[in-house]
Amino acid sequence: MEIIRGAPALSTFRVQKLMEACVNAALPVRQIYAEYVHLADLSELLETNEREQLEKILTYGPAIEAHTPQGSLLFVTPRPGTISPWSSKATDIAHNCGLGKVKRLERGVAYYVESDTLTVEQQQTLKGLLHDRMVEVVLDDFAKADVLFKRTEPAPFKSVNVLAEGRRALEVANVEMGLALAEDEIDYLVENFVRLNRNPNDIELMMFAQANSEHCRHKIFNADWTIDGEAQPKSLFKMIKNTFETTPDHVLSAYKDNAAVMEGSVAGRFFPDPNGVYSYHTEPMHVLMKVETHNHPTAISPYPGAATGSGGEIRDEGATGRGSKPKAGLTGFSVSNLKIPGFVQPWEGSYGKPDRIVSALDIMTEGPLGGAAFNNEFGRPALLGYFRTYEQEVSSHNGVEVRGYHKPIMLAGGLGNIREEHVQKGEITVGAKLIVLGGPAMNIGLGGGAASSMASGQSSEDLDFASVQRENPEMERRCQEVIDRCWQLGDKNPIQFIHDVGAGGLSNAFPELVNDGGRGGIFNLRNVPSDEPGMSPLEIWCNESQERYVLSVAAEDLPLFTAICERERAPFAVVGEATQEQHLTLADSHFDNNPIDLPLEVLLGKAPKMSRNVVSAKAVSPALEQSNIDVKEAVKRILSLPTVADKTFLITIGDRTVTGLVNRDQMVGPWQVPVADCAVTAASFDTYAGEAMSMGERTPLALLDFGASARMAVAESIMNIAGADIGSFKRIKLSANWMSAAGHPGEDAGLYEAVKAVGEELCPELSLTIPVGKDSMSMKTAWQQDGANKTVTAPMSLVISAFGVVQDIRNTVTPELRSDKGETSLLLVDLGAGKNRLGGSCLAQVYGELGDIAPDLDDAALLRGFFETMQKLVAKKSVIAYHDRSDGGLFTTLVEMAFAGNTGLSIDLSALQGTDVERLFNEELGGVLQVSRADAELIAAQFAQAGVPCHMIGTLANDQRVTIKDGAREVFSETRVALRTLWSETTYRMQALRDNPACALEEFKLKQDETDLGLTVNLSFDPSEDVAAPYILKGAAPKMAILREQGVNSHVEMAAAFDRAGFESLDVHMSDILSGRISLEEFQGLVACGGFSYGDVLGAGEGWAKSILFNERARDEFSRFFERDSSFALGVCNGCQMLSNLKEIIPGSEHWPRFVRNRSERFEARFSLVEVQQSPSLFFQGMAGSRMPIAVSHGEGHAEFASAQALALAEASGTIALRFVNGNGEIATQYPQNPNGSPNGLTGICTTDGRVTLMMPHPERVFRTVANSWHPDNWGEDSPWMRMFRNARVNLG
């Protein structure tokens, strides 16, 4: 093992935060210094030149001055027996640079602590601050790190002696192995193995437990029910299926695959043909949808828990039918009270929590980062979400008790597209090769399916450790590229059948694959790729290593599939063959035995059906006491409640523009305020048809009325999607995610009531279908504290996600109030019809109460009338702005619209019934519309005709105040800025805790700046003019190399932009160049695309660059290309970072900076304002002086120069092409207008001759006007950024 020191691991503010944590923990620590230390496991000693090369590869990131460390060493490394995602990607880079002697690279952080002598307890506390015990360990000596590379002999399987010891042997195994088997399942297994006359092996029992866990089998949803002594006619699942039986319209696949599929629109899918040439293929683009939960792992270890939750859901989408394409994601979190240090709220009590789970604050600090990082790196925009905090002692169905989300909800979902011929899975032919695609087996995530089926607190902590997984999104991206190449072959797609590997690992995935395909299988255990040779058969077969798929490929198609995988560098292995007989055999060549030898029917057969005999309960809770509520104080509290408050800290960490197909993200208007009701995507680059998704959940209402909570969730999802141009209820499909504490008094009967309310009643009445969903039935946390038994039980929680096909994405209405549209009026559509019920509201929550009666959808006809009327108005563009009424009531709806439009309001409540508090804060269904004053009465009449109450409630103010009156009486008045400050303080506090606090403060102050102009546009050219048109007509299109490396994810939209400009875009993978399949001699232009090459592990773009510089063939190819006078190149984002590290082979680039970690130390996804500078860049000719917004998505975009002198030279060279500016056109120096902290706002630069241009922002994602988060009304189909690509075509003549 070689040990190689790296750069300092913590910036100044990170060290400060760590020191503060030490002070808060009363640790006598004086100083901490941290640096990366790299460990290399070698097959033989390196030569001097090889060692130097390895040291260069391991030199990356910002230039921070190292110093000689002092103090005690605490060395944090990944847990032995695991391989970190960093390790696998860094090792790939070393191999691609020709260092074959490096078996594996690993990285740790060496902390040097100067302190007084620490007690054993203090040492443990300090270690707790330095590492995540779920995925890391702390060593006191570098030499001890060799345990990371220790290889142990494989362990054999173990048998459980049922034949001799009977049922008792299985009962013991059930507890020891954490199998979560029910009594009748133990009986079933004993009976079957006695019949087979043999003992079960541990691997067979674990496989059975996973395949039959509540998590996988949904036993409660398939159970027979008796409630209050009366047998119920249907199971829960049958009631859900009733929605499909009633309205099967437009559903192509339901209840049988990894995701549901509905009919989409016809458009031109843009992808490369087998020769690599990108083009449009006009065909139906059907829409798949899926929403998953990953609650248990997120409670244990939030970052990997949420990351692998997102990853698993993305795999479900990719593994739908015979392979498909994930497109856009959504996310959701429900947690207990945050109790932000220094910002604890009056309603946040301190009830405690068990040690084995983390706090709500930890979950919301780390979990969203994990989920966002996975989506970012995979390349899926995250466009929608919800966030609720709830933890309260209330009187509900089971008397007085604490209800809340100690076991959190972590929701991950999304939509994708699938070809018509691939919607149904194919036939698995006898003799077909059964393949695992993706990463290696690792000893992690064991028993996740069974573990998440238990209430938190029933399994031992060691088993909780085992059920945490690791994420490697860059690997999943490679696998998805393989799936893409396969579906792009149409009827020649080699994939017959595909499933993702999730809970239970291969032990669940392979049996499911062959069983669904009507086959059996013979498998060879030792063919499973594994990084840990010491694993037992159970560990190899049942571990939940991520980023894996299982699939069947006909033997004759194996060479084609192999070639695709090798080009994409996606690992795969043939593990078995499909058999006619439905039997499962797993052979182990190492021990020459069969750890599994079972008929499939024993594993997946008629395990006993569950029966639930339950009693219903009625909630009795006093009415909300209104007399002590002051409107001004109520406003302050409600705007500080995380459920209502600004969610920026959850949004800007997630890429929202990748694909170039995003039409509507969360951020609205020129001030980019996160208040959008739904997300909208374009079907492709050549159409205005698209897809929309929204969410609805009103979980606290279930503490009063289960049915109301369910109806309100469905209704809220419809109210949210109503601003998109969908047309009919039948074009909307719902995913239902049900969370409940099964067995808790009253909850089972309540769950039945809720499912019945939507499955049997509401959805059929509205022609809505629920073709997909998920359940999580163990939403309770139990523990002992100071000798007392404590529990926190979640409310029955239904989260609805609505997916719709959009007719015209240009018609989407947002909450942005417009003060430039003449005289306008605000209308309140009140589906609550004046009932003003306050039970379960945010108002009740912030005063520590529950209230007595929940709001409800009393008549489905109200929702039908609203939606159908709204859709007609949206299609005719009669609505200027729209926002639904939900959490926080009418007051919140109005002020959020005011924030988005940067305007004041003048509101009159006199048309509404009830007290001030009821009118402002009730959360009945409803919405506010801004319409032209001339149309207002006509529109109000249309709603009234549809049976929906509608009231005129005011207009925009001439000043920046929100004034609310009841006739002449003033009810409330405050400045918009003061309200925005209250609303945004929660996000500021969370950002300051998690990111660079200086950046968080700058953003908070910007939100309070009344003079901020937001995004402004000033163009020096006409964007509607196609300057390339005369050249396109001349003849053959010039060839453009659309260059990607493993992990790049922005190549398709880049190809589309150059295609529109008249180029022939060709897909070129680095493996094509390294293998000699393709030469850059063939191309006039090259573009290095954005993404996460090698997952950015050795510095963003640096690993990619080094694999060129240290590979002779690649270096020659690129050197010759850049030396050619006729060639040109563009590097965007990751491509910019990569090219900036190739300075030594690019003429005229000596003055370029490197691009390193953002000042905020956070991935920044922003819609930022830039100005084009006067420069020789051929891409920006005729554009100088233009100011316009552009997509920014990067974690390492800070331009770092070697010295102040180097920066001055770059400025003097006249090659700076692009700068961040503010709305006045001044250079942006403050965050987030300068999102990465680059000096002088620098974000684009070129060579001295202008042939090679680098830029961090993404023009290819916004070349269509509809792909811009905000744009002036007068822009046509092409945004101004299209000019860049056309300039490149003009340059070639």
Swiss-Prot record:
Region of interest (Disordered), ranges: 305-327
Annotated binding of ATP, by residue: 305-316, 676, 886
Main location as per UniProt: cytoplasm
Keywords: ATP-binding, Cytoplasm, Glutamine amidotransferase, Ligase, Magnesium, Metal-binding, Nucleotide-binding, Purine biosynthesis
Classification via InterPro entries: Class_I_gatase-like (IPR029062), FGAR-AT_N (IPR040707), FGAR-AT_PurM_N-like (IPR055181), PurL_large (IPR010073), PurL_linker (IPR041609), PurM-like_C_dom (IPR010918), PurM-like_C_sf (IPR036676), PurM-like_N_sf (IPR036921)
Subcellular location field: Cytoplasm
SMART domains per UniProt: GATase_5
Domain Glutamine amidotransferase type-1, first and last residues per copy: 1040-1293
EC identifiers of the protein: 6.3.5.3
GO molecular function: ATP binding; metal ion binding; phosphoribosylformylglycinamidine synthase activity
Pathway: Purine metabolism; IMP biosynthesis via de novo pathway; 5-amino-1-(5-phospho-D-ribosyl)imidazole from N(2)-formyl-N(1)-(5-phospho-D-ribosyl)glycinamide: step 1/2
Substrates-to-products reaction catalysed: N(2)-formyl-N(1)-(5-phospho-beta-D-ribosyl)glycinamide + L-glutamine + ATP + H2O = 2-formamido-N(1)-(5-O-phospho-beta-D-ribosyl)acetamidine + L-glutamate + ADP + phosphate + H(+)
Similarity comment: family membership: In the N-terminal section; belongs to the FGAMS family.
Function: Phosphoribosylformylglycinamidine synthase involved in the purines biosynthetic pathway. Catalyzes the ATP-dependent conversion of formylglycinamide ribonucleotide (FGAR) and glutamine to yield formylglycinamidine ribonucleotide (FGAM) and glutamate.
SUBUNIT field: Monomer.
Protein name: Phosphoribosylformylglycinamidine synthase
Organism of origin: Shewanella sp. (strain MR-4)
Lineage of producing organism: Bacteria, Pseudomonadati, Pseudomonadota, Gammaproteobacteria, Alteromonadales
